[in-house]
A protein has these predicted regions:
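Alpha-helical scaffold elements that line and support the substrate/ligand-binding pocket
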Residues: 44-46, 50-51, 76-99, 103, ...
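Short active-site loop at a secondary-structure junction
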Residues: 33-43, 64-126, 144-157, 223-226, ...
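Aromatic-rich carbohydrate-binding modules that target alpha-glucans
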Residues: 460-515, 521-547
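Catalytic loop of the DD-peptidase/beta-lactamase superfamily, centered on the K-T-G motif
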Residues: 24-57, 167-172, 176-180, 184, ...
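N-terminal leader/targeting segments and the immediately adjacent pre-domain N-terminus
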Residues: 3-12, 18-75, 91-99, 129, ...
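Catalytic-site signature segments of enzymes, centered on catalytic residues
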Residues: 74, 129-202, 216, 221-236
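Active-site helix/loop module of the DD-peptidase/beta-lactamase fold
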Residues: 23, 76-80, 92-135, 169-211
Length: 547
């Protein structure tokens, strides 16, 4: 008997040492991955056999403070907000207070869309499977993109609507319902859809893709589609609850839902994919400078979630998942996510630190000035150039786009990107010439020709049904590129450039009678019209009445 006890103790010791070795290996690998991708920090939890197996919090909260993250540091959950909310919806379904297939208008009249009779068809099931027909976010008045229940169309607006229904059924704010139903029962003490004062001392700052910290959003109202603040410590508790809840797994089973493509369907609150390791539920999160990813294997009670404070956070999803699961991931292909080691990301990141010609040199064909298109596609180079252009690194963008034209001299997309770069530099003539080339190569899109005319101050053809409106912006004499964007041009901040005329930036547009919202965009900065006293107090959009 003593020998047996010693053997058992020895086996337990070996198992423990193996787990420690795996953990150390994973920690080293995670640090390498985020460093290579230019990500300040990652918070990750790995669930196995229905319980928390490993957790990692490594990196820094801010590029400036260098303060390390820990297991209580709060991150933005982005669209993981939807998955957590879906669990609370399930609780209402289980208590028979909500029927997934009963039209929502019978619970609550949603005034934002009630003018369209199709809103009477929408159910909770449609919203949870992203088949409500609503857009992701409204641009002005909320309108249906598609008929309800017919096809997949990712929609945050749908979740906002469903949260109003939940508030009507429960008689309390959705944040209070989430606290009572999910957060407090699961001891998720660092989770809320509204910013809490106790978060002030320990939260991660968001960072751009070139590792610059940006302003943190502190949500004052609950948005169940996007505003959840949490971390891997709390989210692991949520995942453990879901993976061990047989009723939830049967109610929200993985073999139902609406198809996204042949390998992926969307079930209630999660995407579903079939992998070589088994069926998964997944959800990604993208709030710009916070990125997250969650995946579970319900049949194995296994899963992983990670949070990052970087615009590059989803670029590491493939590398992170490989550390824990030896499986294909169709969802990552569908989301078009590369590895952190992918040439597209490495050229971009290295080009921030050195001349971009040197960064791309390893990917040129030997002895030539042409790109190895197996490693870097035409669209990849355009994507990198566009990211540089957004940062104001115009010379880097032009270098890449001109190199792309060596490989693809008839690439309309390259000319379009080149035209926009020249435009933002303030080189009107070069930009107009380039936009004309883009139009000549691809007449499927007529906006390049329209934009070339606007840049050269050639007026649009007169439309007698519309009224000519002249907008002026005084000052900003040193600006390179000024435009006006609004509800009249789908908030496109490039299509309506302004010209410096007699001491002010000026443009003329033709509009039908109605009410419009707009802003000026000065070298990428959106501003309210200082001459117009009529503006929206929430968005600060200037309001234009055309009679």
């Amino acid at each position: 008997m003593p020998i047996l006890k010693k053997c058992i103790a020895f086996l337990l010791l070996i198992t423990t040492l193996q787990q420690v070795a795996f953990s150390q290996s994973h920690l080293v690998s995670l640090r390498e991955i985020i460093n290579e991708a230019g990500i300040p920090a990652i918070s990750l939890a790995y669930i196995k056999d229905g319980k928390l197996q490993e957790q990692y919090n490594t990196g820094i909260k801010s590029a400036e403070s260098k303060e390390p993250v820990n297991d209580s540091t709060v991150f933005s959950a982005c669209s993981l907000s939807k998955s957590v909310f879906s669990y609370a919806v399930y609780k209402l379904v289980k208590s028979k207070k909500l029927d997934l297939d009963r039209p929502l208008y019978l619970y609550y009249a949603y005034k934002d869309v009630e003018e369209d009779e199709r809103y009477k068809q929408v159910t909770a099931r449609m919203i949870l499977t992203h088949s409500s027909g609503l857009p992701n976010w409204r641009n002005g008045k909320l309108k249906f993109k598609y008929d309800p229940g017919k096809q997949f169309s990712y929609s945050g607006e749908g979740f906002v609507w469903l949260s109003k229904v939940i508030e009507k059924i429960t008689g309390e704010p959705v944040e209070a319902y989430m606290q009572e139903t999910v957060f407090r029962p699961l001891a998720m003490h660092h989770s809320s859809y509204i910013w809490q004062k106790n978060f002030d001392s320990n939260y991660a700052y968001p960072h751009t893709d070139n590792e610059r910290s940006t302003q943190k959003d502190f949500p004052s109202t609950a948005n169940v589609a996007a505003s959840l603040q949490t971390n891997s410590t709390d989210c692991a508790k949520f995942m453990v609850a879901v993976l061990n809840d047989k009723d939830f797994l049967s109610t929200f089973k993985t073999d139902t839902g609406i198809f996204v493509d042949k390998n992926i369907r969307w079930n209630m609150g999660f995407g579903v994919e079939q992998t070589s390791y088994g069926k998964t539920n997944f959800q990604w999160g993208d709030n710009g400078t916070f990125k997250t990813f969650l995946i579970t294997y319900p049949d194995k009670k296994e899963g992983l979630v990670y949070f990052t404070n970087s615009e590059n956070g989803l670029d590491i999803a493939r590398d992170v998942l490989k550390l824990f699961f030896n499986s294909d991931q169709p969802a990552l292909d569908w989301l078009k996510l590369d590895s952190a080691k992918a040439p597209r990301l490495q050229v971009y990141l290295q080009g921030l630190k050195m001349p971009v010609a040197d960064a791309i040199a390893p990917y040129l064909l030997p002895g030539k000035k042409t790109v190895d298109t197996i490693l870097l596609s035409q669209s990849s180079i355009v994507d990198i150039a566009n990211r540089y252009e957004e940062l104001g690194y115009y010379d880097k963008a032009i270098t890449l786009l001109e190199l792309n034209l060596v490989n693809y001299p008839s690439s309309a997309s390259t000319y379009r990107s080149l035209g926009e770069t020249y435009m933002r530099m303030g080189d009107v003539n070069k930009s107009a010439e380039t936009w004309k080339k883009a139009y000549a190569l691809d007449k499927q899109y007529d906006y390049p020709q329209t934009l070339a005319n606007h840049l050269l101050n050639i007026p649009d053809a007169i439309d007698t049904s519309k009224k000519k409106i002249t907008l002026q912006l005084p000052d900003y004499i040193n600006a390179h590129f000024v435009t006006v964007a609004g509800s009249f041009n789908n908030w496109n901040n490039a299509i309506q450039p302004m010209h410096w005329i007699n001491g002010a930036w000026e443009t003329t547009i033709q509009l039908t009678p109605g009410t419009y919202r707009y802003k000026f965009v000065v070298d990428g900065v959106w501003i309210t019209d200082p001459k117009n006293p009529n503006f929206n107090k929430d968005s600060f959009d200037s309001i234009l009445e055309v009679n």
